[in-house]
Swiss-Prot record:
Its EC number is 2.7.4.3. ATP binds at G12, S13, G14, K15, T16, T17, R130, R172. GO terms for biological process: AMP salvage. It catalyses: AMP + ATP = 2 ADP. InterPro entries: Adenylat/UMP-CMP_kin (IPR000850), Adenylat_kinase_CS (IPR033690), P-loop_NTPase (IPR027417). This is Adenylate kinase. Keywords: ATP-binding, Cytoplasm, Kinase, Nucleotide biosynthesis, Nucleotide-binding, Transferase. It comes from Campylobacter curvus (strain 525.92). Monomer. It is found in: Cytoplasm. Residues 33-62 are annotated as: NMP.
């Protein structure tokens, strides 16, 4: 049985960096970023990649079935039994679909959802300061923030109701954030 941990947070919250550091420091964890999974598909130049790019380049969500298939395939294909995925779910529909898919099988057990909590001001400062890609400009950031904020209360409520939600303060230096997340994951 594979253990699944989801790390969610605003754009610029550090969720991808946190998750990748945990996986790098401890090889019993595999880390997948939904953003990286989707960007890899775009980079491949495939038809699916072009379709994904038409959504990502505007800061919009990629269609549900594409994302869920990419995630489940990555989990099942991993040699590791502890899987960390960041940046998912980003909508109530994604959350519901993942819950449905996980409920219908017995290979993957969702153990926890960790929210890396940062203010919008900190998120904006980090994203606009990193200039990682064409999606890191003010207009696209505003759209990405709206896409994140619109469903977050419903997502929190759903996972809190399942006793899976844990919140970590993301407005500190990276070491204590990573240590807190790792401690949570090890105890779930």
């Amino acid at each position: 049985m594979k253990k699944l941990f989801l790390i969610i947070g605003a754009p610029g919250s550090g969720k991808t960096t946190d998750a990748s550091l945990i996986a790098k420091e401890d090889d019993k964890y595999a880390h997948f970023s939904t953003g990286d999974l989707l960007r890899a598909e775009v980079a491949s130049g495939s038809e699916l990649g072009k379709k994904i790019d038409s959504f990502i380049s505007k800061g919009n969500l990629v269609p549900l079935e594409v994302v869920v298939n990419a995630i489940i395939s990555a989990i099942k294909g991993s040699e590791k039994s502890n899987i960390i995925i960041d940046g998912y779910p980003r909508s109530v529909e994604q959350m519901t679909e993942l819950d449905k898919v996980l409920s219908a099988q017995n290979e993957i057990n969702l153990r926890g959802v960790i929210e890396v909590d940062v203010s919008e001001a900190i998120a904006r400062e980090r994203v606009l300061g990193r200039a990682r890609g064409a999606d890191d400009n003010n207009e696209v950031f505003n759209n990405r923030m709206k896409v994140y904020l619109d469903p977050i209360e419903a997502i929190r409520k759903f996972y809190k109701g399942k006793n899976l939600l844990h919140v970590v303060n993301g407005e500190r230096t990276i070491e204590p954030i990573v240590a807190d997340i790792k401690k949570l994951i090890e105890n779930l």
